[in-house]
Amino acid sequence: MAAPEPLRPRLCRLVRGEQGYGFHLHGEKGRRGQFIRRVEPGSPAEAAALRAGDRLVEVNGVNVEGETHHQVVQRIKAVEGETRLLVVDKETDEELRRRQLTCTEDMAQRGLPPAHDPWEPKPDWARAGSLSSDAGQKDVNGPPRELRPRLCHLRKGPQGYGFNLHSDKSRPGQYIRSVDPGSPAAHSGLCAQDRLIEVNGQNVEGLRHAEVVARIKAKEDEARLLLVDPETDEYFKRLRVTPTEEHVEGPLPSPITNGTSPAQDASAWKRDPFQESGLHLSPTAAEAKEKARATRVNKRAPQMDWNRKREIFSNF
C-alpha cells in the first residue's frame, strides 16, 4: 500500500486558453478567504492541478488571504494571459492552521517543516503558546519574545510603499491589511494585521482613516510608522498603556500583579468622562445614571456619508 502524499501547498501555473482559465472563484459565508468552487474539465486550471475546494493563498507571489473577492479577481487579471496561484486543499489548510504556520511558495517545493522542528517559522501574530503574565512569551526551545511595538522606517519605491491600510468596522484603529513581497514595507518589517499607533512620531489612534492617510502622505518619500502586532496590542491593552517609541527599546510597562497596576490607575484617570470639560472628577451615582440614560437616547449612530466610502481602504 502506497504511503499517503505529504501535505503541502500547491503552486499552480495557469496559461489562459480561448475560454479563459476555466475555474470559478467564490467566497464562503463564515470562512475567511477565497475558494475554488469549480474547475472545468479539460481547462488550463485542470491541467495546472487546481481543484474544487482549494483555498487561494497567493496570486503571482502576493498574499491575498485578507483581500476581498473583487481585489483577488483584479490581481488574477493584472498579468495578461497567465497567472500563478498558491493554493491549499482542506487538509493542508487545517494542518497549517493547527501548527500556526504561514503558507509560502517555499512550502510547495519543500513541503511543511517537521512537526517538532524547533525552527518552524511562525507569523508574528501566532507565536507558540499563549500570552504569559509578563512582557515576553515563552518559546519551547528559545528565550521569551518580548512584546514590543516596532518602529518601521519606509522609503517610497517606484510602486509606492507597498502596503494596504484599512479600518475594521468591528474594532477601532487602522490596520495593515496586506504587504507586497519585496516592497519597502516588507523590507522595513511591516506585517499584515499590525495596528498602526503613530505616524512620524504622532499618535493616530483617534484619527479617521482619511486623516491617517494624510499624515502618511505628509512626507513625500518617507514615513516612520509605529506598529504593534495583535499579541503586543493585546498585552498593552491589558495594561491600559498606549505604546510609544520609547517602548521599542526602552523599559516595558510592568504587568498587573495582585491588583491594579500604576499604569492602569494612570490610564483610568486619563479616561475620566469629565476630563474633557476640565473637571477631573469621578461621577456621582446620579450623574452616572443620567449619563447612561442619555447614552441610550442617543445611541443611534449618525447616518454614513456615502461620499466617504473610499476612506475604508487605501493603498500605498
From Swiss-Prot:
GO molecular function: protein-membrane adaptor activity; type 2 metabotropic glutamate receptor binding; type 3 metabotropic glutamate receptor binding
Pfam families: EBP50_C (PF09007), PDZ (PF00595)
Cellular component per GO, a single term: apical plasma membrane
Tissue expression notes: Detected in kidney glomeruli.
Region span, Disordered: 109-148, 244-303
PTM annotation (Phosphoserine): residues: S130, S183, S254, S282
InterPro entries: EBP50_C (IPR015098), NHER (IPR051067), NHERF-1/NHERF-2 (IPR017300), PDZ (IPR001478), PDZ_sf (IPR036034)
Polar residues biased stretches: 255-264
Primary location recorded for the protein, binned into one broad class: membrane
Keywords from the UniProt entry: Cell membrane, Membrane, Nucleus, Phosphoprotein, Repeat
One of the GO BP terms on file: protein localization to plasma membrane
Keyword Membrane carried by entry: yes
Residue ranges constituting the PDZ domain according to the UniProt record: 11-91, 151-231
Subcellular location as annotated: Endomembrane system; Nucleus; Apical cell membrane
Membrane topology: Peripheral membrane protein
Entry function: Scaffold protein that connects plasma membrane proteins with members of the ezrin/moesin/radixin family and thereby helps to link them to the actin cytoskeleton and to regulate their surface expression. Necessary for cAMP-mediated phosphorylation and inhibition of SLC9A3. May also act as scaffold protein in the nucleus.
Quaternary structure and partners: Homodimer, and heterodimer with NHERF1. Binds ADRB2, SLC9A3, P2RY1, P2YR2, SRY, RDX, PDZK1 and LPAR2. Found in a complex with EZR, PODXL and NHERF2. Interacts (via the PDZ domains) with PODXL (via the C-terminal PDZ-binding motif DTHL); interaction is detected in glomerular epithelium cells. Binds PODXL. Interacts with SGK1 and KCNJ1/ROMK1. Interacts (via the PDZ domains) with SLC26A6.
Protein name: Na(+)/H(+) exchange regulatory cofactor NHE-RF2
